Amino acid sequence: MQIHRLSPQLINQIAAGEVVERPASVVKELIENSLDAGATRIDIEVELGGAKVIRIRDNGYGISKKDIVLAVARHTTSKISSIEDLECIKSMGFRGEALASISSVAHLNLTSRTAKQNEAWQVYTERYTEKVMLLPIAHPVGTTVEVLDLFYNTPARRKFMRAEQTEFKHIEEVIRRMALARFDVTFILQHNNKIVQHYRAVKEPSQYWRRLSRLCGNTFVNNALKISWQNIDFSIQGWVEDPSCIKLPEMQYSYVNQRIIRNKLINHAIRHAYQDQLKGPHQPSFVIFIVINPQQLDINVHPAKKEIKFYEARKVHHFIYQALMTVLQQRVKLSSDTCYSTTQKPIGKIIPSHALNQLNEGKNNILVSYSAAAKNADELLSNQIIQDPDEAKMQDIPAKCQATKNSCSTSLSNDFYSFGKMLTFCSPCYALLESAQGLSLLSLQFAERYITERQLTPENNSDTILAQPLLIPLRIILSNGEASALHQHRLLLQRMGILLQPNENETILNAVPLPLLRKKNLSNLILDLLRYLNNETSVTYHKIASWLACSLNSQITTWNYSRAIPLIAEVERLCPHWIKNPPNALIVKLDLKMAIKALNNS
């Protein structure tokens, strides 16, 4: 098979497969560009759920004539220029591939004007050609991006698009998340020439509740606790569920430096803070904003920038946990003393965008000492004053909380699914945990092996594990015994996501399930698997999954908090019954009585 260089159009379409999943992905990328351009108003117009037209108009800085043609080229950006910039990302976008990727699967028109220019300029690609055209046009200061006929040249992708209303709901959710992150920006959404949503900019933090009620609903607003906590490294602001009030619809939005992200570490810290507050498997609702020095983050870990990694995961986890515990404990104390007869003013305010910029530049003077804040938590809470009657409305507590106040102060650990708080590692592969029942030691190796086994095992005989196609199919030479095992168990392996194409004394590996992608040498793994199957008289999904899990996880030698905490959370989610009755190989309670007795006698 001859190796050849891919064409620029094909390269862009491959990149678009990662960036442009559906119309909502296009809307997200373009809005992020508008926010990076300093826009205070963004108009979003879509037709037919975004399949026909997506038009994003903003009043940002605009793009000059000399840069506008370059803007639609791949890997061109004004946001970073060096490795140092990549390690300290302050903008929403940074890769410089969004416009190029979109233009490879749709017809794109880019119109922009800066304040220094007397006329605007438009760049567009001629249909069915790669030629870029530039012409002058009338346009106010700012930028308009028009995306027409999305996936017109990739019928397979267009076939997988959902119904018009479904795609539009995804776009609405993107706008909702963006509007929560940027209270200072007006968002106007139109669908089929009708205004569907109009979120007006809110300048004063005391009025944030107005947008919050529109985005999250009055039920959440009327039963949410305001959280505001800071130390020298981090800041957390937002609203969290009051566990003593009515059960809220599960709504979880977390932002880091104004970027909407999903992160198991954040969710785990919040869930542990609520471990004695909520009954059963109900998950707490929250809208939180975390500010952290961008040098302490790795944002370049996901094609759509939906995930991040913290360099100091343990410190972040501990900070979030302590911040929420302080707010929840103060609420319980206030409940037992006054039964919420007073109205609470939120502690502090949401950090404005200029504060984030100061933090990015290292000016940490906007943050106060965490220890000092913790010391004065009672004083901060007792000295709260209502400044706005509408703000008081947000903090009103329903009368029905009276009936449930006693439940907050009692432990609900029997009903909550958690092994406890992770303290540290014990070599080589154990985590030291602390819970209401004491200290325990959890085997991370056993936990990871079990999770991998679950990922590789179909729910029933009719199910099929999702296969991940390999970029380059792998050719594997087989012995007679290995070929015989493949012939006998090929369909079973196929249902497990391992797609092998036999051909005399060799096979082509086309796809594997996600966990197997971690394996460096897939060829050896497949050969070992076929030898194992050839020696087994009875083969089941569970046996193969167990063998693969042991083979994959035997290579793990080092652990970190970013890896361990989400793993423990995943075990808690998949196997809540293990909290009360764990397998002996997973966790063991530590008895410190003998050690304490020995110390006392020495």
From Swiss-Prot:
GO cellular component terms, semicolon-separated:
mismatch repair complex
Q: Identify the Pfam families for this entry.
A: DNA_mis_repair, HATPase_c_3, MutL_C
* GO annotation (BP), single: mismatch repair
Covalent S-S links between cysteines:
none
Keywords of this entry? DNA damage, DNA repair
**What Gene3D superfamilies does its record include?**
3.30.230.10, Histidine kinase-like ATPase, C-terminal domain, MutL, C-terminal domain, dimerisation subdomain, MutL, C-terminal domain, regulatory subdomain
Give the GO molecular function terms.
ATP binding; ATP hydrolysis activity; ATP-dependent DNA damage sensor activity; mismatched DNA binding
Q: Which SUPFAM superfamilies match?
A: ATPase domain of HSP90 chaperone/DNA topoisomerase II/histidine kinase, DNA mismatch repair protein MutL, Ribosomal protein S5 domain 2-like
Q: Highest taxon of the source? A: Bacteria
Family statement = Belongs to the DNA mismatch repair MutL/HexB family.
Entry-linked PANTHER family = DNA MISMATCH REPAIR PROTEIN MLH, PMS, MUTL, DNA MISMATCH REPAIR PROTEIN MLH1
Per the entry, what this protein does is:
This protein is involved in the repair of mismatches in DNA. It is required for dam-dependent methyl-directed DNA mismatch repair. May act as a 'molecular matchmaker', a protein that promotes the formation of a stable complex between two or more DNA-binding proteins in an ATP-dependent manner without itself being part of a final effector complex.
Q: What is this protein called?
A: DNA mismatch repair protein MutL
The gene designation is mutL
